[in-house]
């Protein structure tokens, strides 16, 4: 946003230099990126009056002009501009003058004719060709109003000015207008802000007699209003208005279009001017575009519309693409006499999608995208009516034709002086705080200690108490707040939360087991999004992914861990042991946020123990991976059980579900050989646990158990069972009948082969007995052992 100091003075008067103002604004959080001085590098530039023009005797394209520059005698200047003529007021660079680019003006002879100065174009005095009125693009600038020869040309052009260029953050859309900036400056200097004139002399004729407005979807268009102005005269706008537009980076067109742009910059409220007679009906209908509907915009481009686009129509045909660009046949032309002025509120998301899809970014669309101030919609239209009456001889019809609701102009937020002072660490009185809010243009209501701040709609960045605290600190001055130690109501010693403590314990266990922690992307390809998922739900896909490999939110940590293992193995690091604690995401119903669940996953491949002179090589296998998982359960004081399972992507015979309190909380298994081969991996084992589920059950500590005072007893038992019976089922039966003296069990041998029937296997299990209160006797242990054996026989086992 470009802010002219000359224009700013119309609303707020301060006694300070522009450089100081820019510094103060920057210190409050609005960065002034540049300070543009239009007088820089310019010297001896005056207004001249061309008294006569004659053709150069030796050059067809040159003219010899006698120019009055306010001195005793006119000066002779040779000029090659095609539009120079007698009777014009022009810009003259005198001899000894200087122009941008280091150009110095000297006396010269051009084809034998003396030339004492230079008649200038706007481009030659530093104005970008992008902003020069088209009538002066290829020639000198000619004043449209009489001037006094010899006066300062920059003053006559309203260019003796300095312009601040703001680098605004998206939340400060209020500073995208002169009035919004004026409120900010008035607050900084504790002075009043004067708003511009908006009252017109209206005709007795009502706009309601000539126009109706209908909104079909108020969710997309909450409010639409229009006013009508008759008998406008299309001509160039005043010099001062053209200059302000040029300094703001907008090319002047004519008085009607310029007034629309001027009010846009003044209020931050985009307007659109329609040629009333070209609309083709007395109704305006605002609706969603029809599928396949087309319209030609002001840039003479035919646009194919989507149903998500908002269009302004005459009841049948689109006459404007809402908030983005007008239509060609209803635009204001030189012959236009009657004007319809549009002021509206459009859905920011719809405008952003339309403007980006069609690559039609404009001053208007950028403001609609950020949200506009409801308080200024009607006021901006009234301002345009006043300017059309004043500078286009327009006749303003009374009444406003509107549909929809403007919505609230203010948002009340309650706060106390104590809350503000505790946050910024400085004592300000309630009166001082209220004064700052009033400086910002915020009305306040006081009820004992509570200050109710009525935040105007132009400040959409202020929604909570902390935003108000920031405003107080900004306006008071960050540099003026003394440095103090923070004050706390209650001081507590720092410590880890219960979850942080448990998470740290798990990480220590895994790192102690030789695993390295990995952190991988939350985004995966759409194909991998549901791989290894424990809850097969619809994928959550990005609307505009940067790549196909990162198009969806993951439902498992394993796809990227497998990728990481493959990456390491390909680079000769063949012994890979990784774990990750991270979030996975599961979709819910339409309009609901997805579930975010924390998982713990691991992958192991290669050798667990490297072959050294004192150690034998130990390759990763299922039981090693299971041992890692069991160490996690022990650390969290949990008891896992395992159940054979078939899971896509894992070996069909070497995979198990992990259960906690009879609920599946994870799985463990060998990577399917085909998947392993696809990733250039040898035998690889993975596990995945619902970490949130573990945290919900884990007490996080282990009860102290004293060292046994009495000796224990061990008994071994060998069982012949069907080969399909898992050892876990046998152990479950043993523990169910072992009473309180059976402490633990250990499978120490499994045999299949010679001396056993086909389809059978032999399992040897050691049972450890202990009573913490007394010495066990053989009779007591034998009785329990007999009960266990009877239960096993009933299960189909044969005691060997």
UniProtKB/Swiss-Prot annotation:
One of its GO terms (biological process) is phenylalanyl-tRNA aminoacylation. Mg(2+) binds at residues 461, 467, 470-471. Residues 408-483 form the B5 domain. SUPFAM superfamilies: Anticodon-binding domain of PheRS, Class II aaRS and biotin synthetases, Nucleic acid-binding proteins, PheT/TilS domain, Putative DNA-binding domain. The keyword Transmembrane does not apply. The keyword Aminoacyl-tRNA synthetase applies. Residues 39-154 form the tRNA-binding domain. Binds 2 magnesium ions per tetramer. GO terms for molecular function: ATP binding; catalytic activity, acting on a protein; magnesium ion binding; phenylalanine-tRNA ligase activity; transferase activity; tRNA binding. It is found in: Cytoplasm. Residues 708-800 form the FDX-ACB domain. Its EC number is 6.1.1.20. Keywords: Aminoacyl-tRNA synthetase, ATP-binding, Cytoplasm, Ligase, Magnesium, Metal-binding, Nucleotide-binding, Protein biosynthesis, RNA-binding, tRNA-binding. One of its GO terms (cellular component) is phenylalanine-tRNA ligase complex. Its cofactor is Mg(2+). Belongs to the phenylalanyl-tRNA synthetase beta subunit family. Type 1 subfamily. Tetramer of two alpha and two beta subunits. This is Phenylalanine--tRNA ligase beta subunit. It comes from Staphylococcus aureus (strain USA300). The gene is pheT.
